[in-house]
From Swiss-Prot:
Disulfide cross-links: 53-76, 67-73, 72-97, 85-104
Known role: Poor inhibitor of platelet aggregation. The disintegrin inhibits the adhesion of the alpha-4/beta-1 (ITGA4/ITGB1) integrin to VCAM-1. Inhibition on alpha-IIb/beta-3 (ITGA2B/ITGB3) is low.
Lineage: Eukaryota, Metazoa, Chordata, Craniata, Vertebrata
UniProt entry tagged with the keyword Secreted: yes
Propeptide: 21-47
Motif Cell attachment site boundaries: 89-91
Additional comment: Negative results: does not show inhibition of inhibition on alpha-1/beta-1 (ITGA1/ITGB1), alpha-2/beta-1 (ITGA2/ITGB1) and alpha-6/beta-1 (ITGA6/ITGB1).
Keyword Aminoacyl-tRNA synthetase carried by entry: no
Self-association and partners: Heterodimer with EO5B; disulfide-linked.
Source organism (scientific name): Echis ocellatus (Ocellated saw-scaled viper)
Protein name (record): Disintegrin EO5A
InterPro entries attached to this UniProt entry: Disintegrin_CS (IPR018358), Disintegrin_dom (IPR001762), Disintegrin_dom_sf (IPR036436)
Listed SUPFAM superfamilies: Blood coagulation inhibitor (disintegrin)
Length: 115
């Protein structure tokens, strides 16, 4: 009887005890799913199962779709290779989509001080 009572009290007083993690993205507004030895960042709004690109069970792109979000993702598909994803004002060394990822890779010809 005593152990059951203690468990009941603990659950009533501390119902949501758990370990804390620091988000890999550093942004407290991002959602992240944590798997053993892997952290997958979810885009804002991905927790909403109505997201058109996201499988609500796995939070991965639906079958036949390439991506959920990102600068090189539109309508659940990767943008074509060579599409400008970050335009620069001064030097003309824009960043371009690769056609195989939703990320916007940095132009390899830019110097360290350029951005």
């Amino acid at each position: 009887m005593i152990p059951v009572l203690l468990v009941t009290i603990c659950l009533a007083v501390f119902p949501f005890q758990g370990s804390s993690i620091i988000l890999e993205s550093g942004n407290i507004n991002d959602y992240e799913i944590v798997y053993p030895k892997k952290v997958a960042v979810l885009p804002t709004g991905a927790m909403n199962s109505a997201h058109p690109c996201c499988d609500p069970v796995t939070c991965q792109p639906k079958q036949g779709e390439h991506c959920i979000s990102g600068p090189c993702c539109r309508n659940c598909k990767f943008l074509n290779s060579g599409t400008i994803c970050k335009k620069t004002m001064l030097d003309g060394l824009n960043d371009y989509c690769t056609g195989v990822t939703s990320d916007c890779p940095r132009n390899p010809y830019k110097g360290k001080e350029d951005d």
